[in-house]
UniProtKB/Swiss-Prot annotation:
<dbReference type="GO" id="GO:0016324">
    <property type="term" value="C:apical plasma membrane"/>
</dbReference>
<dbReference type="GO" id="GO:0035332">
    <property type="term" value="P:positive regulation of hippo signaling"/>
</dbReference>
<feature type="region of interest" description="Disordered">
    <location>
        <begin position="38"/>
        <end position="71"/>
    </location>
</feature>
<feature type="compositionally biased region" description="Polar residues">
    <location>
        <begin position="204"/>
        <end position="217"/>
    </location>
</feature>
<feature type="compositionally biased region" description="Acidic residues">
    <location>
        <begin position="38"/>
        <end position="50"/>
    </location>
</feature>
<feature type="region of interest" description="Disordered">
    <location>
        <begin position="204"/>
        <end position="251"/>
    </location>
</feature>
<dbReference type="GO" id="GO:0005912">
    <property type="term" value="C:adherens junction"/>
</dbReference>
<keyword id="KW-0965">Cell junction</keyword>
<dbReference type="GO" id="GO:0030054">
    <property type="term" value="C:cell junction"/>
</dbReference>
<feature type="region of interest" description="Disordered">
    <location>
        <begin position="292"/>
        <end position="320"/>
    </location>
</feature>
<comment type="function">
    <text>Regulator of the Hippo/SWH (Sav/Wts/Hpo) signaling pathway, a signaling pathway that plays a pivotal role in organ size control and tumor suppression by restricting proliferation and promoting apoptosis. The core of this pathway is composed of a kinase cascade wherein Hippo (hpo), in complex with its regulatory protein Salvador (sav), phosphorylates and activates Warts (wts) in complex with its regulatory protein Mats, which in turn phosphorylates and inactivates the Yorkie (yki) oncoprotein. Schip1 promotes kinase activity of Tao and enhances phosphorylation of hpo by Tao.</text>
</comment>
<feature type="compositionally biased region" description="Polar residues">
    <location>
        <begin position="62"/>
        <end position="71"/>
    </location>
</feature>
<feature type="coiled-coil region">
    <location>
        <begin position="550"/>
        <end position="594"/>
    </location>
</feature>
<dbReference type="InterPro" id="IPR039045">
    <property type="entry name" value="SCHIP_1"/>
</dbReference>
<keyword id="KW-1003">Cell membrane</keyword>
<dbReference type="GO" id="GO:0071902">
    <property type="term" value="P:positive regulation of protein serine/threonine kinase activity"/>
</dbReference>
<dbReference type="Pfam" id="PF10148">
    <property type="entry name" value="SCHIP-1_C"/>
</dbReference>
């Protein structure tokens, strides 16, 4: 007999009913006679139930029914997969008549039709009319074994337990894999020698006679499943929209990283090129680490580190370093791949850790030697004579800028933001340059005086004057004086070039052209006043002026343009006249120059003749 219990209206979000929320998809839950327990009904329900006497009568014939069912199960286990209709009819005859009457389809349909409303009967008609899904075989059929009692195929809320399990699997890395590994360890797979054999029960058809053996399928499933495989449970999980995936198995990152570093170090030390080996044959063997001496996390690691530190502290560099070799002869050591970027890779931290005092002194000596070579180089001497020693001047200027607080900012930016500050800085710089120039001029005078005194002392050695003319000494003085003057002029020009450029830029930016003055005067005549800051006429200003005033402005501008054209023609005529006069003057100068050259040559010839006559 089937019992139908109405649920009524229940809020699935209420805390007390959340665990039963998945059972709210149908208005009725069917319980078969095999699923319904007597403890579910009260005494009053049993008395009101019209089928209570038939149940009592049914219990008397239950023993014969169980015996017949056990015989069917034994046949299935022995491999007798075929059951004839005669045997099924005979077995049904062994069942009492009361039980057969209670299981008749007509009586069940008539009782359900009396107890169900029309709407509910029409909705649940598919379950009653479908022979593949009878009302009492929901727990017997192997297709629906995994479902809980009262759970419908359509899941509203979802499998709460499955979702929680998935969240735990996402949080705990490697949960499933570790669980499966433990299960495989527990099973004695080494003892399996034969292949897996099937007993053929999966090929049985679900007939009316084999459905009776549905209760024992749970017991037989453990026997029929292959050894070492897990039982697959059929579920109706809610499709998850979570894009996260289960992470892979975890492994020990510490040991992996330690192995990686050890392997990398070994590769670096083993992949040294042969050239470097030939260049440095006297390397200490203690600098190269040994793989056998490395112990990760051991007590001997600290001792090894102390020994290495002591060896490094007591080490002395016997050979020259790459840096000093490159400084000594860059052409020779430029082919060495280790010395290509030596100067860029020179680091103070490396010096503090890897160099001794002796090596630093050697480096200092090498730098001094290189500086001496640079000083005695002819090209460097020519550059210093032509331009002068810029380094001292630049250093002094940088110091002065640092003291004034300019701090590597351009004077143009200072002049744009704060003109007073820029003027003060420029004034200080000009004063500094003037003092520098005065010092250099005094030094040149002292040098000239010393040279004159030396010449005089050389001419009056031992009180005997030497008969030498004064012409060579005057020539030397003239040369050194001109050289000093040229150097001073070059330095002044270099020092003032920035100031002059800034002044020109200011004049271009803030300078007032005559056209601007003319436009302002014309606008003032009309009655429009412009500030000194406004240098351009905007379109908005012109649109506000009336048409006759604009016409007057246009006429004034045309008159001014005509006057400018007249003055331009007059200035061009004057330029032509001046060019012609200049050509005449240059022609006259050329004649005079030729005359003087002729006179000089003739005078020299006369002097030569006179000298030869005196000598003769």
């Amino acid at each position: 007999m089937d019992i139908y219990i109405t649920k009524g209206i229940t809020n699935p979000n209420y805390p007390g009913f959340q665990k039963f929320a998945h059972t709210l998809s149908d208005d009725y839950i069917e319980y078969s006679d095999m699923e319904c327990n007597e403890s579910d009904l009260t005494d009053s329900d049993r008395e009101d139930d019209p089928t209570f006497p038939s149940k009592m009568a049914k219990e008397s014939g239950s023993e014969t029914f169980k015996n017949g069912q056990d015989s069917i199960l034994s046949n299935c286990d022995n491999g007798n997969t075929y059951i004839s209709e005669e045997e099924s009819v005979n077995r049904s005859e062994n069942i009492p008549d009361i039980v057969n009457e209670n299981y008749s389809a007509t009586s069940e349909n008539s009782k359900r039709a009396l107890q169900k409303p029309d709407l509910i009967y029409n909705l649940s008609q598919n379950y009653t009319t479908n022979p593949e899904f009878p009302s009492w075989s929901c727990t017997i059929n192997s297709k629906y074994e995994g479902q809980l009692q009262g759970q419908s195929p359509i899941d509203i809320v979802g499998d709460f337990g499955g979702e929680v399990e998935r969240e735990f699997e996402l949080l705990l890395t490697g949960y499933k894999n570790k669980k499966e590994a433990d299960e495989l360890k527990g099973s004695n797979l080494d003892k399996i020698c034969d292949a897996e054999l099937s007993n053929g029960t999966e090929a049985l058809k679900q007939t009316s006679s084999t459905r009776l053996s549905g209760n024992s399928t749970r017991k037989n499933k453990k026997k029929n499943t292959p050894y070492g495989h897990q039982i697959v449970k059929t579920k109706h999980p809610k499709p998850s929209h979570d894009e996260r995936q289960l992470p892979p198995d975890t492994f020990d990152y510490k040991t992996y990283s330690q192995r990686k570093y050890i392997i990398c170090d070994a590769d670096q030390y083993s992949s040294v090129p042969e050239k470097n080996k030939n260049d440095s044959p006297n390397l200490n063997q203690a600098e190269i680490p040994n793989m056998s001496s490395l112990e990760i996390g051991g007590s001997g690691s600290q001792q090894n580190l102390d020994e290495d530190n002591n060896k490094v502290a007591s080490r002395k560099y016997s050979n020259q370093s790459r840096w000093s070799q490159y400084l000594e002869d860059p052409i020779k050591y430029s082919k060495d791949p280790c010395s290509t970027m030596v100067l860029e890779q020179f680091d103070a931290y490396k010096i503090a850790n890897d160099m001794d005092v002796e090596t630093l002194q050697n480096h200092y000596k090498k730098v001094k030697q290189i500086e001496k070579k640079r000083r005695f180089n002819r090209d460097e001497i020519r550059k210093r004579l032509a331009i002068g020693d810029k380094d001292s001047l630049n250093n002094d200027i940088k110091k002065e800028e640092f003291l004034t607080g300019s701090d590597n900012e351009s004077y143009s930016s200072d002049s744009e933001t704060c003109p007073k500050l820029s003027s003060g800085v420029l004034r200080k710089q000009s004063e500094f340059c003037e003092t520098k120039r005065n010092k250099e001029f005094e030094n040149d005078k002292i040098f000239q005086k010393n040279q004159i005194n030396q010449d005089k002392s050389m001419n009056h050695m031992n009180g005997n004057p030497i008969g030498t003319t004064d012409y060579p000494s005057d020539e030397n003085l003239f040369f050194f004086a001109n050289q000093s003057k040229l150097q001073i002029e070059v330095r002044i020009a270099l020092a003032q070039s920035k100031e002059i450029a800034q002044m020109k830029v200011k004049a271009r930016k803030h300078g007032v052209t005559p056209i601007v003055d003319v436009i302002r005067s014309m606008l003032c005549d009309v009655g429009i006043k412009m500030n000194s800051n406004h240098r351009w006429i905007s379109r908005q200003l012109l649109t506000g002026i009336q048409v006759p005033t604009l016409q007057l402005l246009v006429n004034n501008l045309q008159e001014y343009i005509e006057n400018l054209n007249v003055t331009l023609l007059e200035s061009l005529k004057e330029r032509d006249d001046l060019n012609s006069d200049q050509d005449d003057i240059l022609h006259d100068l050329e004649k005079i120059n030729n005359f003087f050259v002729f006179q000089q040559q003739s005078g020299q010839q006369v002097n030569k003749i006179v000298r030869h006559g005196h000598l003769d």
